[in-house]
A protein has these predicted regions:
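N-terminal alpha-helical targeting/anchoring segments
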Residues: 1-134, 149, 153
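TRNA-recognition modules of translation machinery and tRNA-sensing kinases, especially anticodon-binding
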Residues: 27, 130-391
Length: 391
């Protein structure tokens, strides 16, 4: 979410950014925002004038009453009453305009970093780095689910009866291995100086709309029926939400946290739930990292967080490559993003295991995450997130 002043003063820059993301259908939003903002400010000015006049007349009424001029006082009371009706209508209109303005502003993409490659889809993402030797075996490699089944470590059939497709039971040594990978990732991040946290696994709607776009929300989130609660799709959601409406002293920054949680995703719009594998599923567990920092430090932290992902997989001797997401593949709130992919010997290709993202001040603006400077200044923080591991 961009600053309204920025949109007002740079409409063509905002439109050009939308074009770079190949989302021309969002271009009308810019003019609509500017028009609604002008109307809202006009209404606000008139409302403030009425409030000032009302306060002035109220003082005059008191003076007239003290002088015994009741008839003149009564006339002014009637004027105040009429102004009160007009003010109530203006306040209603202002709230209506504010809601319409906010709805449109939430749909305008964040300004991407100048270094982001221009492209329409993930097919245009750019390779940044490759680590390790990718080998294609000269023998038939079994599916990972077949290996798990050999050790009696997975039961998809029972899970299908209990919850449907996209779920599974992990058991025995496979379940222990799953937990061990998460524990290894947790300790890896703690050694990097991150504070370990287990967050709430449900969040309110204002946090959901604070951390993601409407498109992402519709494609990912499960809503709890009858409650203003959603199951988290990643612990980033509740971890960033932890700092809603807060001020953090500059001296306390950066805030570096690593969190564990189960994650719940509809996977709406994905290429289906895999028949043989357990890659795109509705429930999984993940270790996450988030950073809240000063704006001038966010790109430095972006590179650090990405390097931690690569280092973790290198420590496990797993070949990985990094792709920079092009403009059209970036979610609306993101300024810059890298996907880290691991090599699958069975499939003979890389697949995504981490997504490192810098969101600038977009989430901070929506959620009111602010920094208090040593000189008393107050400004928005930058937020970043990255997957550690999701076994």
């Amino acid at each position: 979410m961009l600053d309204i002043k920025f949109i007002r003063e740079n409409p063509e820059l905002v439109k050009e950014n939308i074009r770079k993301k190949f989302k021309e259908h969002k271009l009308p939003l810019v003019d609509e925002v500017i028009e609604l903002d002008a109307k809202k400010r006009e209404v606000n000015t008139r409302a403030n004038e009425l409030r000032a006049t009302r306060n002035k007349i109220s003082k005059e009424i008191g003076a007239l009453m003290a002088q015994g001029k009741r008839e003149e006082a009564e006339e002014k009371k009637q004027l105040v009453s009429r102004q009160a009706e007009e003010l109530a209508e203006l306040e209603r209109l202002e709230a209506e305009l504010a809601a319409a303005l906010n709805e449109r502003m939430m749909k305008i993409p964040n300004i991407i970093d100048p270094s982001v490659p221009i492209g329409k889809s993930d097919e245009d993402n750019v390779e940044v780095q490759v680590y390790g030797e990718t080998k294609v075996a000269d023998f038939e490699i079994p599916y990972h689910t077949d290996i798990m089944a050999k050790f009696n470590g997975i039961d998809k059939a029972a899970a299908g009866k209990v919850a449907g497709e996209g779920f599974y039971y992990l058991m025995g040594d496979i379940a222990r291995l799953h937990s061990a990978v998460l524990s290894y990732a947790r300790d890896f991040m703690i050694d990097k100086g991150f504070t370990y946290c287990i967050p709430p696994f449900m969040i309110r709607s204002n946090v959901v709309t604070g951390v993601m776009s409407f498109e992402e929300m519709d494609a990912m989130m499960y809503k709890i029926e009858g409650e203003d609660l959603y199951l988290i799709g990643t612990s980033e959601h509740s971890m960033i939400g932890k700092f809603i409406d807060t001020f953090t002293n500059e001296s306390e920054l950066p805030l570096t946290l690593t969190s564990y949680s189960p994650c719940f995703r509809k996977e709406k719009g994905a290429h289906g739930i895999e028949e043989r594998g357990i890659y795109r599923i509705h429930q999984f567990e993940k270790q996450e990292m988030i950073v809240i920092c000063k704006p001038e430090e966010s790109m430095e932290w972006f590179n650090k967080m990405w390097s931690y992902s690569v280092e973790l997989f290198r420590s496990l001797d797993i070949p990985v490559r990094t792709l920079e997401c092009c403009s059209g593949d970036l979610a609306d709130l993101k300024v810059k993003s890298y996907d880290v992919e691991a090599w699958s010997p069975k499939q003979g290709k890389f697949f995504e295991v981490c997504s490192c993202s810098n969101l600038g001040d977009a989430q901070a603006r929506r959620l009111g995450i602010r920094i208090k400077g040593a000189d008393g200044s107050k400004y928005l923080a930058h937020t970043l997130n990255n997957t550690v591991v999701a076994p």
